[in-house]
Amino acid sequence: EPYLKNRQIMRFKDAIYDLNNNVSQPGIYAIPSELSMNSPLVPMENPDPVYGPYIRWDLYKELGYPQIDALEDLLPVLKQMQELEPAADNGEKTYAFSFFKDWDSNLMNAVKQPCCFYGYDEYGFVLVKADSSDYQSIIDPDSLYVRVLKWYFDANQMGLVDPESSTQTFESFETKYKEGQLLFCTWPWVAQPAYNTQERTKEGKGFMMADIGDMVIYSYGCSPVGNQKVVMSIGSKAEDPERLAAFVDWLYSPEGIRNNRAQTSGGMAGPEGLCWEYGEDGPYLTDFGKKALLGEDVEVPEEWGKGTWSEGISALNYSTVASCELDEKGYPYAYLLWDSVRNMNISPLEIDWREKMGAETTMEYLQKNNKILVSPGTGYMAPQENSEMAAIRRQCRKVIQEYSWNIVFAADEAEFNRLYEQMCKEVKELGYETMLDIDLWNAKKKEDARWEAV
């Protein structure tokens, strides 16, 4: 704590103390991430949500923008898109869907993502609606999780699922978007940076969000107390804790915020004077910034240290503040939210999407059409589970993961049903209902904390 006294990071002192009040010994042991001065009801994401139905818009346009009323209606559209472009530029077969196991936790991660199209996110073995109006056990036959399992099963029966999904890594998954082998993505922050190169978007090609008639996308609200699960700390055996504290303070300064997140596509704007400047109408990108921030690995001028842009940018995957935060002059730190950038060299892809959707950005469309549901930000931390409960959870999640993958790739509907019933039977024998009760209790406590923050 003495190392942070009178430093600028203490403008976030309420959030810092909120986190450290949970520690038995007084003092400051950690700084939360993704801090925000905004209301908990303000979406943290902009100009795109974390989740959404992102498709190859050029192929969707070629089909005449068919109406998609519900999740299930998307499959025949994706099949027609696959028929329009059966092979990628590298000669490999195209698929709508591809998965990987790296991020599986209490469930199959790829199945959880489309649940977010309907305002739900996971909490243990529970799907929680952003407005706290519904709580679902993931294995309930009427749950969204089971609905998406069936959706992916149907997609696989139609030849829309990449058969390499169960053995590949995230890196392989991402590469397939770069190569044009995939036609759908639940994450704009994967598909768009990978596929939407300037060359392709000039041709009208790229991933953009399509509308599903009944979707209401889950959005993470800004948290005044930040993300208390991902924190910044100084080790007890650090040789120079005062110097490290100065570095942490810099990371949370306006300069540090911009420079640290400049490596992320659509992130912060990088160094002032090199990547951007303030003009009469607000911030704008320099010629160097346009190239570097939009994916070109340019040479850095000698006065800035020489070398290439990719060699010098931060490799720290850590967000000190929310993407929607404003700087000291009232402009967003995230350059994609600047008026000068939003209207800069708009590609034929973006022009067509804007004309069809009647909005300049995805978030603007979702907000105008009441298709987003914000979960208020909070720093609620669940009590730590004892060893017995942790063991039951490990066993249940292992069963749910393995069966979920097998269900998606089941040979036919009879096998789908058999595997689903067997999954439910096995986890219940392991103690699933006990864990479900714990998760429901914690989920409701977290929701109470969210609305208290509002």
Per-segment meaning from a language model:
Residues 4, 23-108, 128-176, 185, ...:
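Helix-loop-helix "hinge/cap" segment bordering the ligand-binding cleft or interdomain interface
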Residues 1-20, 78-82, 92-129, 181-200:
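Carboxylate/His-rich catalytic cores and anion/metal-binding grooves
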Residues 258-402:
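Conserved small-residue motifs centered on glycine
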Residues 403-454:
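Histidine-centered catalytic/metal-binding microenvironments
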Residues 1, 195-217:
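Ligand-binding "clamshell"
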Residues 1-12, 121-143, 217-220, 275-302, ...:
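Short, solvent-exposed loop/beta-turn-alpha elements that line the ligand-binding surface or hinge
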Residues 62-67, 135-139, 382-390, 405-412:
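Second-shell loop/turn segments in exported
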